[in-house]
Amino acid sequence: MAHYFVGDIQGCFAELQKLLAKVDFNPSRDELWAVGDLVARGPDSLATLRFFRSLGDSAKTVLGNHDLHLMALHGKLKRAKPSDNLTEILESPDISASIDWLRQQPLMRELPEHQLIMSHAGVPPQWSLEVLREEAALVSCALKQDDYLEALISQMYSDSAEQWDPSAIGIERLRYCINALTRMRYLYVDGRLDFDCKQPPENCTNPQLKPWFEFASPLRQSHTLVFGHWAALMGNVGDSKLKALDTGCCWGEHLTLWHLEKDQKITQKKLKKS
């Protein structure tokens, strides 16, 4: 059995299939773990989502910001932009089933036997494993409720929840968790989330900002952290226990697959349009 972890697919289904062929992926024996953002921007979000649904227990994904955005669009809480490239999936006959499937996916997953944690954007350095589990579970619980659109999705878009406050309750607590696990890149020196800078660290001009993974963290010491979201890193973080897998396929770069057992990365360049 092999565990394969794939970066942000974002509808780049053909590239995903090329990658899986390279490693002879077999869902009857292997598992495919995705760091989230299965959909948006790329040409084939519908096929990507249907493929993951078809894999059953052989597929493990976490929610990314674009997956949550799809829920908001389906619930008519936001207007789609042309760059979302989600018209086909929103008009598909199985869109409700796809949304229901996404609602069952968590914000973080663990592989305890390998001391590994996967989330879309990373893990706040202030959080212990226990806090991470608790906060992610609160969001998962809210997503599974009948009123998830009104109680959570309609209120999740806010930059106000930028600082971790263990005494926060209700939507503010859920917002911080969503912001941290699906949107985080840089933190201010006081631990606040920054939502603006997307550049790689060498190009960041604000001395008050540091990448989240450069802060001291108990989980950074004890676990391998697998994440995506930050395409500008191009997988370069300089730490063998950090696996940054978003390598910008939807922007014309490549899709990255990491074979856990071999600690090997396999890449597939963005395919040219035929």
Swiss-Prot record:
Source organism, top-level taxon: Bacteria
Keywords, comma-separated and alphabetical: Hydrolase
GO biological process: RNA decapping
Protein EC: 3.6.1.41
Enzyme class (EC, first level): hydrolase
One GO cellular component, as annotated: cytoplasm
Entry-linked Gene3D superfamilies: 3.60.21.10
UniProt cross-references to InterPro entries, sorted A to Z: Ap4A_hydrolase, ApaH, Calcineurin-like_PHP_ApaH, Metallo-depent_PP-like
Catalytic reaction annotation: P(1),P(4)-bis(5'-adenosyl) tetraphosphate + H2O = 2 ADP + 2 H(+)
Family label: Belongs to the Ap4A hydrolase family.
Name this polypeptide is given: Bis(5'-nucleosyl)-tetraphosphatase, symmetrical
Organism listed in the record: Shewanella baltica (strain OS195)
Lineage, top ranks: Bacteria, Pseudomonadati, Pseudomonadota, Gammaproteobacteria, Alteromonadales
Gene that encodes it: apaH
